[in-house]
Amino acid sequence: MITEGAARRVHIIQGEYKVLNDPNAVLSTILGSCVAACLRDPVAGVGGMNHFLLPGSATSPTSGGDATRYGVHLMELLINGLLKQGARRDRLEAKIFGGAKTISTFSNVGEQNAAFAVQFLRDEGIPVVGSSTGGEHGRKLEYWPVSGRARQYPLTGAETQRTVALEQRPAAPQKPVETSIEFF
């Protein structure tokens, strides 16, 4: 077994997902009202994590750079990424984290995010084997995608507020893909 200090850390930010089959890797993220879904296929030895800001739906505006903020888009990308790495849909299992109510005056988007993730996974037939959602404080999450081990650390009030500020920033513009062609 690899020691925690020797683990290869891969940080996931809002709007991203990663799929790995490296037993020495740990995925990490910091969550406020955002949700991270951690999925894996224990037989194929592959797993991944996403980090979404808003639940989204078939009627949500999910085009351009904004698509990566929505759970509906990132859940599909994560599942497809796992399947491309040899996972089978019927063996996938999930853990869900985040969805805190970080500001009392805002609508509870964190609760909506968590409910979306649970419903999406139920609709896809993917069992949720663990979750930690809600509350009033953010959390730092670590997930070992091959073993499925997860660990979270609660954030202090000040850390939660910094996370809220990051979550409210506009999405970063998408960088062109290296193989793209720009027309004038």
Curated annotation (Swiss-Prot):
Stored Gene3D superfamilies: 3.30.1330.200
Catalytic activity: L-glutaminyl-[protein] + H2O = L-glutamyl-[protein] + NH4(+)
HAMAP family: CheD
Top-level enzyme category: hydrolase
Function comment: Probably deamidates glutamine residues to glutamate on methyl-accepting chemotaxis receptors (MCPs), playing an important role in chemotaxis.
One Pfam family from the record: CheD
EC numbers, comma separated: 3.5.1.44
Name of encoding gene: cheD
A biological process from GO: chemotaxis
Family the entry assigns: Belongs to the CheD family.
Keyword flag Hydrolase: yes
Keyword Hydrolase: yes
NCBIfam families linked: PRK13497.1
Protein name, per record: Probable chemoreceptor glutamine deamidase CheD
